[in-house]
Amino acid sequence: MTDAPPTTGLHHVTNVCTDMSETRAFYEDVLGWHTVKRTQNYDDPGTPHYYFSPTPAGEPGTNVTYFEYPHGRGQPGPGASHHFAVGVEDEATLQEWRDHLQAHDVRVSDVKDRTYFKSIYFSDPDGLVFELATTGPGFDVDEAAPGSDVIDPYDQGYAGDGDDDGDDGGGH
């Protein structure tokens, strides 16, 4: 451990989209999230900055925010985010989400077994990869102390099929 001051966890995550109305429709109509704040980028006045949350009040730690840059395109690689994961209670809920996403014409992966949890993957309108992951049994039962074991997914038969880039229904 270090002598770093404590933190309380993630406050929010900010991404970039090319069309805020399309992003807002995705969060509200497909994911069922709430638009909890509409403002502008404080460092780039005039650039829309929206906050979305699965909770009506948008408590810290639940917000995903977006800046709108219509002509901006990121690329995968160092310094870029690969995906972000949102928890669901159990495998039944994960399957409900898979069915729900397919009903909204969202390409979604099969359920992936990730040793500690199970997941599905899909992308938003700009290609940002989402993961929905079960909460258990997971981290509290697999090791004596968190981070004490190294799991090799190839040795244990959990490795992906290489179809995990998010643009074709895969995504990790």
Listing of model-derived features with the role each one plays in the protein:
Residues 1-3, 69-75:
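Short beta-strand/turn micro-motifs at beta-sheet edges
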Residues 63-67, 131:
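Conserved beta-strand in the GNAT
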Residues 22, 31, 36, 63-64, ...:
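Catalytic cores of nucleotide-enabled group-transfer and carboxylate-activating enzymes in metabolic
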Residues 11-12, 49, 59-62, 83, ...:
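Histidine-centered active-site/metal-ligand motif
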Residues 15-61:
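Core segments of cupin and vicinal oxygen chelate
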Residues 1-6, 10-17, 72-100, 103-172:
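Vicinal oxygen chelate
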Residues 22, 26, 31, 75-77, ...:
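Long, contiguous binding/interaction regions
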